[in-house]
Amino acid sequence: MHKDEIQNLTALEAASELEWLAKEITRHDVLYNRNDQPEISDAEYDALRRRNAEIEALFPELIRPDSPSHKIGAPISEKFEKSVHSQPMLSLDNAFSSEDVSEFMERVRRFLRLPETQMLEITAEPKIDGLSLSLRYEQGRLVCAATRGDGYVGENVTANARTISDIPQVLQGKFPDIIEVRGEVYMRRADFQALNVNQQEKGKLAFANPRNAAAGSLRQLDSRITASRKLQFFAYACGEVSEIFAESQMGMMEKLKEYGFVINPLIKKIKSLEELISYYHDIEERRHALSYDIDGIVYKVNDLMLQMRLGFVSRSPRWAIAHKFPAEKAMTVLEGIDIQVGRTGALTPVARLAPITVGGVVITNASLHNEDYIKGIGSKGEPIREGNDIRVGDTVIVQRAGDVIPQIIDIVAEKRSKDASAFVFPYLCPACGSYAVREIGEAVRRCTGGLICPAQAIERIRHFVSRNAFDIEGLGKKQVEFFFQIQDETLCIHTPADIFTLQRRQEKSLVHLENMEGFGTVSVRKLYDAINARRKIPLSRFLFALGIRYVGEVNARRLARAYQNYTAFETAAMAATMPDDKVGKEGNEAWMELTNIEGIGPQVGEAIIDFYKEVHNREVLSGLLCEVTPLDEESVMTASSPIAGKIIVFTGTLTRMSRDEAKALAERLGAKTSGSLSKKTNLLVAGVGGGSKLTKAQELGVEVIDEEAWLQLIEG
């Protein structure tokens, strides 16, 4: 929608759109910053933010408390400890043209009241496509590494950051007592390609691009996995410092290099707008010759005193801007359209392309979004691509922008063959032959086959064993497909319970898994160990693993907190499926309690009811609950707990559960947990790589136990 259309909005229409934009931008912030799974390109995201800002400028009285204009990043994950930034980690405003850069320079001059005759030095450097990280050093030693998070509170990933060779553990030379160094964690393209080969050999999902690989590698719960990935780090700024050690941005970079950091060698000091634009185009031409991905150029006022005077607006500094590169495009032929079936039955069209290189990457597949997109219809029913549909055999324009899967953005109509026929989206599921229906108001067509659909069944098992669900190492995509498709009843896995009975079935079998291609004695033993380690699991993870529609990680935690234990949740869900015919759902106490939980509501409630109405789902659950135990969200029996009232500290990497899970479990059993040792600490649980806390515990006389002793203690 263009600016003149915004000016035609009524106040009611503007308020409605601002509400939608707030929700949509927040959703994409979470997908990008927390889940490392963006759905839209940087350009599309920036367009949403620009539209939000333009409507707010026209209707300032309608600015919402949750306006995206005031937000940075996304809420942090609950998998990591929180780390509060002493100075906010702000994002940058974007420029998309030379005119935007010129306006930035003019704004800076106006704010500082600098005449045109006075030189204004700017530093320019490539904008690395990675994950922002803040490193805090005290007395020259690294004490904390934190992700950006929401800009104010990030995730503590110190153990993982220590495995990156570009990050010094101890600073060199003369340095401030306290200094926060900020920069970008990234992965070189060659290392990214090698990692994906390794992922595929292990039957695991490949990463979409180096940025996602870097982010996923840094945010591992096991630092040994991070250490196995070849991550790099460029320093580009400072946060809190105890003393001023430079007068300019370039001077700061030179000092950071002396301290032992890696600085991007392409950084340059520039004295005019013309030079800035020339530098931008020069790097744009050279970007594919670099060993790492960049998505623009960052300009900063060089003088640090001027930076202080310029200060900040709500979510970005006035003294810096990111000049983004345009999305990269190429022309190729659409050879076919494949339909993929997801775990919820969604039919997703994927374009099969004649191989084409876009942005240094060979592209053979691209997103087609949904049925309407192929027909030339937008999300609000408006025509897109001038109403042209997409047909097999068309010459198409493919765009690769930032972190998202490549997408077809247009066709070359004049190259279309006269014989090309319109694509007919299937009304039957390609995996099981069941009807595929499209509900009113939805863009997605879904298979109605449910649990008889093999494609859905495989995807549901993959979801069940995924990292944020049961997190069973050794059950990647290839392994799940193998176990699902094999005919031997002692090896097959068709339901979650089958995972946990596999070892028992194998003990009575003449066909041994160790002798199957791709397996061996060691890998099978590790698989059984990984499975058995998950026989007790937090309630929130259990609920998420069930794959109930709309019950993602966040809603699973909400439900776990509300019901505390699985029996209470299941009882409520079953009661909610039986509304009183006279008064309807509103008269059903269980339904009202369920849908009144913050963030749940009728849509999620209906999905839960639909899940529990299905007899087969209840049978699958019954079998699963014979094998696993969902742990109560909060123990009501702490009085007899051997750790009730004790102060416990965890250090190092635990192998049977994450440190966050161990802390939550300790607290449910009545203990208090802390991140630091003191004379009041009763117990230190030391995993692999406990480090300095072990020494300090001995000095303080604190009892130290390993993970096995910890498990024996709590199982008691």
From Swiss-Prot:
Catalyzed reactions: NAD(+) + (deoxyribonucleotide)n-3'-hydroxyl + 5'-phospho-(deoxyribonucleotide)m = (deoxyribonucleotide)n+m + AMP + beta-nicotinamide D-nucleotide
Binding site for NAD(+): 42-46, 91-92, 125, 148, 184, 300, 324
Binding-site residues, Zn(2+): 429, 432, 447, 453
InterPro entries recorded: BRCT_dom (IPR001357), BRCT_dom_sf (IPR036420), DisA/LigA_HHH (IPR041663), DNA_ligase (IPR001679), DNA_ligase_AS (IPR018239), DNA_ligase_CS (IPR033136), DNAligase_adenylation (IPR013839), DNAligase_N (IPR013840)
EC top class, as a word: ligase
BRCT domain: residues covered: 638-716
Role played: DNA ligase that catalyzes the formation of phosphodiester linkages between 5'-phosphoryl and 3'-hydroxyl groups in double-stranded DNA using NAD as a coenzyme and as the energy source for the reaction. It is essential for DNA replication and repair of damaged DNA.
Name of this chain's protein: DNA ligase
Species name: Bartonella henselae (strain ATCC 49882 / DSM 28221 / CCUG 30454 / Houston 1) (Rochalimaea henselae)
Gene, per the UniProt record: ligA
